């Protein structure tokens, strides 16, 4: 502990009714801060006052590398050396000290002084990029086709028109006629078939039942809702209908009767 002595100059001077050095320092100053012209200026530095000095025993110990307030610290240099994570007192264990090295520290001083050459692409990549650029903008190569594809185009009837167009200069803004494209895309149909009907998927046109056929079928349905194969064959021969038509008509008639019964039951509940 540091104890201030009672025999210091400032304390003894106050007991003996002596003027304090502050009076010499502030006596020639006006209240507004200006000095009187009649009195000479007295410079009494604060550092020379006896009570302003602190004994060495009371002063805190400062490290040798510490700087005073207001002074500038050393600027950071990227290649100055490794930075340690341990405090200053841990210099006795340099092998355990974790260090961070900047990229310039690992290299030698002569290597750091050399200027790095600018990046240049490899020569092997340059021809590839040139080839890509040439193929990207080479519109004249669109008209040229492979030998195999040319042989395939010769067999189709509309391939001749494409080959004639490919011989001339290629126009990117040209519009192809829709009729010509549709004629080449859809297969050629034989004469006599309607447009849109496939050759092997021909479907019979629906033939409605006549009033006489419907009356005969209704009379048979009133007698028996389910008919056997023999009765169905007799009806088909008599009404000039196929066996499948008679079978489907009875199925549809039973479903119609079922819907009517369900509707009547629903109305009876309300």
From Swiss-Prot:
It comes from the Eukaryota. InterPro entries: HD (IPR001356), HD_metazoa (IPR020479), Homeobox_CS (IPR017970), Homeodomain-like_sf (IPR009057). Residues 103-127 are annotated as: Disordered. Residues 202-261 bind DNA. Pfam families: Homeodomain. PROSITE patterns: HOMEOBOX_1, HOMEOBOX_2. GO terms for molecular function: DNA-binding transcription factor activity, RNA polymerase II-specific; sequence-specific double-stranded DNA binding. Keywords: Developmental protein, DNA-binding, Homeobox, Nucleus, Transcription, Transcription regulation. The keyword Oxidoreductase does not apply. Disulfide bonds: none annotated. One of its GO terms (cellular component) is nucleus. It is found in: Nucleus. The keyword Transcription applies. Sequence-specific transcription factor which is part of a developmental regulatory system that provides cells with specific positional identities on the anterior-posterior axis. Belongs to the Abd-B homeobox family. This is Homeobox protein Hox-D12. It comes from Carollia perspicillata. The lineage of its organism: Eukaryota, Metazoa, Chordata, Craniata, Vertebrata. The gene is HOXD12.
């Amino acid at each position: 502990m540091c104890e201030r002595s009672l025999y210091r100059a400032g304390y003894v001077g106050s007991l003996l009714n002596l003027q304090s050095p502050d009076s010499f320092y502030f006596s020639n100053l006006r209240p507004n801060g200006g000095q009187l012209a009649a009195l000479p200026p007295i410079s009494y530095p604060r550092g020379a006052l006896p009570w302003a000095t602190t004994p060495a025993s009371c002063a805190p110990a400062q490290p040798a590398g510490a700087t005073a307030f207001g002074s500038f610290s050393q600027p950071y240099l990227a290649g100055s050396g490794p930075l340690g994570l341990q405090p200053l007192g841990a210099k006795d264990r340099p092998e355990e000290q974790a260090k961070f090295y900047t990229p310039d520290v690992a290299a030698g001083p002569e290597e750091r002084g050399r200027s790095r050459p600018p990046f240049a692409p490899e020569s092997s990549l340059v021809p590839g990029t040139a080839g890509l650029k040439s193929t990207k903008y080479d519109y004249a190569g669109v008209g040229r086709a492979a030998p195999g594809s040319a042989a395939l185009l010769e067999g189709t009837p509309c391939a001749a028109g494409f080959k004639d167009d490919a011989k001339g200069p290629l126009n990117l803004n040209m519009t192809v006629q829709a009729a010509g494209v549709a004629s080449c895309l859809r297969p050629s149909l034989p004469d006599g078939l309607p447009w849109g009907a496939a050759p092997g998927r021909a479907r019979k046109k629906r033939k409605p039942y006549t009033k006489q056929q419907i009356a005969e079928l209704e009379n048979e349905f009133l007698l028996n809702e389910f008919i056997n194969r023999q009765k169905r064959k007799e009806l088909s021969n008599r009404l000039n209908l196929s066996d499948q038509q008679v079978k489907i008509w009875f199925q549809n008639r039973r479903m119609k009767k079922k819907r009517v019964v369900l509707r009547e039951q629903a109305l009876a509940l309300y």
